[in-house]
Amino acid sequence: MESLTLQPVSQINGEVNLPGSKSVSNRALLLAALAQGTTRLTNLLDSDDIRHMLNALKQLGVNYQLSTDKTVCEVEGLGSAFNASQALELYLGNAGTAMRPLAAALCLSQGEFVLTGEPRMKERPIGHLVDALRTAGADVTYLENENYPPLKITGTGLYGGEVEIDGSISSQFLTAFLMAAPLATADTVIRIKGDLVSKPYIDITLHIMAQFGVTVENRDYQEFFIPAGQTYQGAGDFLVEGDASSASYFLAAAAIKGGEVKVTGIGKKSIQGDVQFAHALEMMGAEIEWGDNYVIARRGELKAVDMDFNHIPDAAMTIAVAALFAEGTTSIRNVYNWRVKETDRLAAMATELRKVGAKVEEGNDYITIVPPTQLQHATIDTYDDHRMAMCFSLVALSDTPVTINDPKCTSKTFPDYFDKLAELSQPA
């Protein structure tokens, strides 16, 4: 297996223009495909998860032109649901942002579809979404294990009506249903069962649906009313915001070893909840400055925090590693859904933090971290999880090197992450 050893860094300084947001890119691509008219997406993310969505749309008969650097995509919308004259198998890798929304959208379509992916995708639950789709008239079959992909979908249309979705595991189930609902034959009311996790991701979904001309009535996140008979309208020029989760590594690096780092492409007007990460860093003692389209972080004496991170689970992983540089015991709470991401992130994070010398308690939905007086040089396993690789790169901001196994796994969202980090790093 390939590995990368990062030598100790004495200071971090500079500016990073963020790659496009994965969450925004895949939602906008799907809605652009269903819309009437053309949408030109700029600052699209070029990564594995987006490529899986683009390949699936091509198989489904969507025409698009992709620029040479793959960051501009002009999509000719179908103006309706997908139709396939022959059975199709769509391979979606480990892209939850493609699997869940496409599963819902294909129920509206005519045709027979199999949705599959890599082995980890077959361990990521989808039952709560399938239950809701079946309530609304969908024909969905599990091909291997109950409640998990691969799925076989026979497109019959969705008739809407009253539907209940369990929101306690992943907000992507609700996102998927919301995006399909305007094309159902009758009005849809979605009721949320359990506590809705990752609410800011629902805000992203609703915001993008509105940009494509569709209205949803959000009744305090407990119920959503979607009138039938709506059509998505091409959004013309659509700028994909920078990825706020990706920003977290650079902002944390500055908080630990700045100098200062300016990230551009997100700011105080961002639609992504993960910009709240900067507030968490500020609570730890970093100095943060906000602009409309940038965030600047500067070094501070970092102190431990004890916080509920349910609203920003992805960026919370970065806090877990920043905790190695903070005084006291850091507690990251209410992150059960780490367990159903690219890997079981609670178990993975606990294992790897212990390798560098931290004292860690791993609970069912929380993790507490006590930093060691001296970080140890360790070889970090990344579990085919892009965020594990990026998080643990921050260990090099000590006077200890760190070795990252399978560094190319960052290609899921940020293929040139290590190059960008090197540009900002001054070797010790």
Curated annotation (Swiss-Prot):
Phosphoenolpyruvate binds at K22, G96, R124, Q172, R345, R387, K412. The active site is at D314 (proton acceptor). Its EC number is 2.5.1.19. One of its GO terms (biological process) is aromatic amino acid family biosynthetic process. One of its GO terms (cellular component) is cytoplasm. Pathway: Metabolic intermediate biosynthesis; chorismate biosynthesis; chorismate from D-erythrose 4-phosphate and phosphoenolpyruvate: step 6/7. It is found in: Cytoplasm. GO terms for molecular function: 3-phosphoshikimate 1-carboxyvinyltransferase activity. It holds the Pfam family EPSP_synthase. Monomer. This is 3-phosphoshikimate 1-carboxyvinyltransferase. It comes from Photobacterium profundum (strain SS9). The lineage of its organism: Bacteria, Pseudomonadati, Pseudomonadota, Gammaproteobacteria, Vibrionales. The gene is aroA.
